[in-house]
């Protein structure tokens, strides 16, 4: 199966440099105040109501698990297919983001984030007129007001960044628009990428950073999920990396060295507060699978997970929240099903490469009509057991034949527990997802609850940003080796990248970093944007999607 390529998603919605109407630009969110809601005058005449209004803006941060009509964004890439859903399953499996239910990623995103931006603009425009809460001191009032203004600026910048990824540079609105006013004279010309990203988003993040909550305050339980100073620097690191990448560098003017500098700025300024989740057992051995799992599922409350930087705070979840992405043998609906393409990207547990050659998408090279890349015989890789003796992150991410999980072991042989006859939700790839699915929910007949907070940025990304940028500046070097080795070591992979003779050039290391970034952040909504900024979306999204069949005797064969 191939996925059709939508190289520039925003072209589907904005086909020219001018926009034609107020409704086209801003959707329906400029409708007048419903009669059953508080008016702006009521909200901004009371400090407590103003605070509630502001904190509600955090709800515009989205959770990525099953967010697109029960489907994940990575199901629209080469990393997975989706088995559960109606129109969206068909749309995503053929790469049609705009057809059927898959359209929600484009249409809903536009209105969703512009609503969030409007709330930010309302807060920023009117907070100075809100009277002080009589119960607060003047110092507290001024301190809180400063924090809320900075948070609104951060959130607005983040919302604009998410819109940029999908639509390119669009109108920058920093005022509260009047639905009865003349909008066409001001908001019909799109800014350049530099004006939109460098001059606005990056400047907003940099200038609001000092006024945000400091680390100590933002990472307490009472402030859980609030925007803190490290988040602004972390988001700048992500955006700078994008702007230095081939897709955007000529428009932005940002260099790889500048991107490296911002990643290093985070490490220097906040590195004592953050770290990879890296627990050891009683003997000092790394708990690779547990570390990788906990990096996402352990909450950041009270510093219990120092890897998480920026996240969406949520209540605990239950069986109903994860059912759509659990194996059918467990009573679930299949959902996100990893591809063999993803499985092929993982190294061996000893740090060696199972295949001889990798391309700029991070994937091994599939030659001609072969579904199996050329195997590196020194690695010990066996395609009859493609998950055996691999990077522990594979076992923490993918449920494969024989894996112990939930109430039993995975069995995807035809007609068996996880691939029963007549069940349309059975995996089309031979795999189910394990990452981001809290297994504690399955306890006591699925009556458990657990946190599954959506991580937007974690410390591993800052390290990977630094490694990628430094390789582009200097080629393979100590800074690159150090970042990659730390990320791989905490996952339980032995051997230093510096000792790999197959990674001795900038080009080879680039392909390796693309591979490492893909598997480290798989199903965290990175791949679909990374392949575009690397200018390799055509190669990544037009190739066949592979899976496996498991015969009655357990024999493995690949399939398209």
Question: Where in this protein do the model-derived segments appear?
Answer:
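Bacterial Sec-dependent N-terminal signal peptides
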Residues: 1-34
